[in-house]
Each structure stands twice: as structure tokens, then as C-alpha cells.
Amino acid sequence: MENNAPVPKLLLQLISSAFQRCRLAEDLCRLSVLLDQSTERDPPITCISIADTGIGCNLEEFQNLRCPREFNGAKIWDGLLSVKTTCFTDDEVYYYHINLDEYIANKRLKRQPSQAKNGAKFSGTEVSLSVFGSMDVLVAPIIGFFQKIIVLQILNVTLDLMVKQGTSPGNQTQYVFAVNADKTPCFTASNLERLKSGLEDYVLRHANCLDTMCDYCFSDREHLKVGSGTVCQEDKHKRVGGTMEVVIVISDLLESTQHCSRSCNGKTEVLYFDNFLPSPVPHLALSALKKIDWKKYGLILANVNDQDGHVFLEWDNFPSYVQIQIALHWYHNQYPTRQKNGPGISLLKKGIKNALDNLKAKHEGFLLSSHSRKICSYVPDLARSIAGLIFSSTDLDFQGDCLSVLGFQTQEVERDTVENYIQRKIVTVIGMNERKPQKDQEAAPFLFFDGESETSFFEDEEVEGEYYSSSLE
């Protein structure tokens, strides 16, 4: 089987349904996937089990599943799903066989003899099937799916994958996927707070390939710059509304990152989640990303690389030591729902822009446009001149008044302290003015005096390719 083979896609559909059943349950749940390959046959056959302790399945989940028995001329499976399921209130465990090759409804599903629970109270579902082909083609997509799904930090669900090849205990491998215990939001945290925390971990642990933060690339999570945005779509007529959440994490890598084989290559990965499940980035989201005015944030988008829904953004003149990660999550206000409507371009653009503006507002002099960066390049000299005027004056009353205006209570303050403070204030005002609508920017007042001069002190020369202003030291 190849990477685009139908069986891995079918498995991810079945795992997605199992995860939703666990997420909707009120209790702690477990989702376990077992791949048990017999090496005695040629080609080898793999028995697959997807088990969860969620709310119990609705057989309608299997109505639209399709998976051919053959791929590229070779038989890949027998087309049969075995399902056993029960709800907490049921007295029995129900067994079914589902033939995915059958299109006639009453022939597609066959009920098997059920089993009494003898008064036991539990719920859960197990789906089993057998396939032919390479184990690697099955394992890699499942691991990638689990690595992304824990970004959402759904705390009541634990995930594990067991891989067996042959009967020897040495040929068994177990993968357990868990959220970072050191930085876990509480159960009452909002979906957005969970997404922010989960994306931070995803960055620090190199796409969750590591169990802990990469010490080569990061010192601690406090150095991450995080912005978030939310846009809501109200219910309208018979259309169920939804919420678009966007989180952007930007990090400066340590110099030792050159020793890390997993360090970033300057590209920005875009993660997309649809109703709490990892999903390929839809075309509307791609269009929204292309329509963002990235230059307003000091970024120059060079290319959008779409690899079957796995999307990377590439930048021009981008610092090699900077990493950007973007996560988009769209979910309906009511779930489950039969509607498949997603967010429009305008909603996606607004969510991304809100996250960028939030990041910009939280960090002074960060993500400034090229024009504002040019203005900021003059700020150190301006602050140095103002501080010089204050401290060179022999009029102590004048000094005291100036320091008081700046918020200092004593004339014993150091000149460097005053100079740095003036720099920060000017950069803050520049950033605030840049976040205003364009019509308000044009009428922005002067920083230190009232004036009506329309003289421009700076040319419109572009300074591109820088993502934040020079450090204020």
C-alpha cells in the first residue's frame, strides 16, 4: 500500500469517530488502536482493532464509509468491518458485521447475536478489520494524527497505539500520546486556552515528536510570543453557527539549534482542525492566508506550499532563527450536526488578522510594518537626544518637571533608565498608531507637541523582510 492508499484513510475516519465518542462523554475515556501483524503469510495480514470507552456508536456513522477491496491491482482487505458497541444504559453488548462494498442498506449491515452485560454498567465501541500490506503505511498516518490531535488538549481522552509484528515480545511497540503535565490547562479552560497551550507544546516538542521540550532549540516557553483571535458566526435560519479560533506562536531559536536534526527550516506549518479533529487545510483557508496583508506585519509571503492539505508558508528575507506556527480551529456551536458548512474567507481572514493584531499588541515593537520599522530606526537617537536635553539642563526645576511627566519621582534616576523608558514609550505609540484604522493614522498627533505641519520627516522607502524592530537596549 502507498501513502495515498484508501485503507489508511479509512482507519483515520474510524479513529476520528472513536475520538468524538470519547470527547462527548462526561467521564475519562481511552482510545486504543492495535495493529497486530502476522508475518507467517505472504503478503502479511494485519488485524486492526480500534477501541474506545466513549458514549457508544450510532450505526449511522458507518453509512457513508467506503473503501475498495483492491488498490493498484492488489487485494488490500476483505471489505468487512466487525463492530461491537454498547451504551451505559444498555443491557447488552451489540455485535454487527458491516460490508462496505454493499450499497443496499438492508444488506450492508447484519446484526450478530448480542451478549448480556449481566448488570454491568459501561459503554464503549470496538471496530475490527483485517488488511494486507506494509505496516509502515498504517503506522505513520496514525502517529501523525495523534501528534496533532493532542494539540487540542482534550483532557478526558488518553490515546495509545500498540504495534505487534509476530509473536515475539521484542517485536511489540507501544506509543502513548499525552498532554504536557507541566503546563496542562484545567478542565474548565476554554477551547481557545487549550489550543494556545497545545500549540506551545507542539512547537517546543517539535510537532510532538518529543516527550519534553527540545533543549537545543528553546530555553523555556516564556520566550514564546503567542497571539490568538476568535470570530463567531451566529445561527442563521436553519444554518448552525460556529466559532473560528486562530493561534499563532512565534519563537526565537537558540544558537545551539544547529545541533538539532528537527530544527525548523524557516517554513511555517499551518494546522487545521474541523470540529475538534485534525483536517487537511481547506481551499478557502488557503485563499484567506494568501489574501492577508502580511507586509503590514513585516512579513513577505513568498509561497504557499500545499501537499495534499498539509500546508507550509514560505517567507522572503526571513530570519533563520525564527519559527512561526499557525493553528486554525473551526467548530459548530452545536455538535453533532448533519450540516457540513465551514467558515467563509472573510471569517477566516478576520480570525487570522485578530490573532496577528493580538500578538502585535502584546509585544512592543513586534511585527511592525516596514514603514513603522523605518520610523523605529530613528527612535534610539531621538530618545538619546531627549534624555540629553533633560540631564544637561542646569535648571533643577525643569529637570524635575520633565522627570515627573515621564513618571519618575526622583531626580536621582539614571540617564540610561530614562532613555530606555522614552524608547519604549515611543515604540509603544508607534505600534498603537499602526493598529488604528488607516483614516485615524493619517490624523495621528505628534508625540511631544501639538502641530499642524504636514511635513513628512521620513521618505516612503520600504524596509522589508524584518519581522520586528531592533532591540531596545
From Swiss-Prot:
The keyword Transcription does not apply. Disruption phenotype: Defective in meiosis. Sterility due to male and female gamete developmental defects leading to disturbed embryo sac development and abnormal pollen formation. Strong reduction in bivalent formation at metaphase I caused by defects in meiotic double-strand breaks (DSB) formation. Impaired homologous chromosome synapsis and recombination. GO terms for biological process: embryo sac morphogenesis; meiotic DNA double-strand break formation; pollen sperm cell differentiation; protein-containing complex assembly; reciprocal meiotic recombination. Expressed ubiquitously in different tissues, including roots, stems, leaves, seedlings, inflorescences, siliques and pollen grains, specially as a higher level in inflorescence. Keywords: Chromosome, Cytoplasm, Meiosis, Nucleus. Component of a topoisomerase 6 complex specifically required for meiotic recombination. Together with SPO11 (SPO11-1 and SPO11-2), mediates DNA cleavage that forms the double-strand breaks (DSB) that initiate meiotic recombination. The complex promotes relaxation of negative and positive supercoiled DNA and DNA decatenation through cleavage and ligation cycles. Belongs to the TOP6B-like family. This is Type 2 DNA topoisomerase 6 subunit B-like. The lineage of its organism: Eukaryota, Viridiplantae, Streptophyta, Embryophyta, Tracheophyta.
